[in-house]
């Protein structure tokens, strides 16, 4: 899969983790009815239309929680670096960076001649502003834990930024590739419709400008004429919000959209046989799980949480509900992440589940299982199947289905505010490192500060992860994550379900569509095949 966008032709930058391990100094070389797609438009004045399953909850890079929304924001906002298809750090708005021998100072050399879409210059002061904003404790940054080592940033000159860290942080530069670290125009924060806390119309340096957004219907972005890099083909890109997978598929087959993500998995084989469309079954780093409220009086007992894991036949759900589009988890993270090791197995064992529930005195307990609809592969259908297994084990389970923004509002609320006992969630790290995945199991990321929505904490895990935060030896760091994974697996803060595949389907007359290893589609430079 090609994940390096052609406009950048980035030079490779060795990973910070490797640099710190060697103690070297590194530097890098240089469904309403919006306009229907017009794939054969002359001069690139056509519209490319993409159907997605969820309505965005925020367009502020700092507030990102969801890869689909981040995909939209990426059309407008760029980052200092990106992760290429070989897992290497590549420059985007930063042409190079250096790491001091002690790992505490990072120096970035910025790309010159870049302007924001409001006409203001991209420079070192803008980078300092953005780094200070995403580390501001007064701003809610759900993925901000990755930048915990940030101490300060200084504009050395117009095109040089020096970042000081409080401790070595092997994952810090990789984290700067995530949309949460997207660089926005400081001037735009005070523009009409925006504020520091409520940033709704992003202004970045990307190839497209934010256009019109109608909640529940669509987002339109338009080509930025003064973009510094390669010009995209399409003048306009429309993201249509279509929660029902079958409706997305129908729109594609009727020629009303050019591309969809997450089609009905039951139709994958038929779509693959259809000469009018192309099917991309991309690998994903996303784990799907049932987050259990570990502060709930019933869920506090680890026997209950383990019982719920034994109660669910994950493989049967994958076979019969997901039509094979997933793999059962054997660790608290996907196998594609650095730090993964095979940890264990909760084989389907209804008798063991019932016994543990009886020992814990939890038979008959009432549980609300909250699920989004249209966000993940067969999410609502899977939740119903899981609820059936839990009822068979002796629990009183009700399923609540919600649109995604409302769902996020509930699961990201403080523990005192009517959180559900269980909710179906997916987590796809923005870079392939356990550092990002383990945010889900740290007390510092309990909502609303972060996305640790199970409110799980374990002092042993905290200690191991604190060591991993600063460990520069790759093998030692990997073992620390493996040790933490084993404890988490036994504690069972989640019902560990599966890693899903990421199906993308698009018009066969289109070329230039691919996927990244972190469950994002890459269609920025899509164009007619002929």
Give residue ranges: language-model regions.
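Surface-exposed binding/hinge segments that line
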Residues: 109, 145-188, 212
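Gly/Pro-rich hinge or "lid" segments in bacterial periplasmic/extracellular proteins
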Residues: 177-231, 236
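Ligand-site clamp/hinge motif
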Residues: 224-270
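Append "and occasionally in soluble cytosolic enzymes with long acidic Gly/Pro-rich linkers
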Residues: 300-388, 392-393, 457, 483
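Extracytoplasmic/peripheral linker and loop segments enriched in polar/acidic and small residues
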Residues: 396-406, 439-507, 530
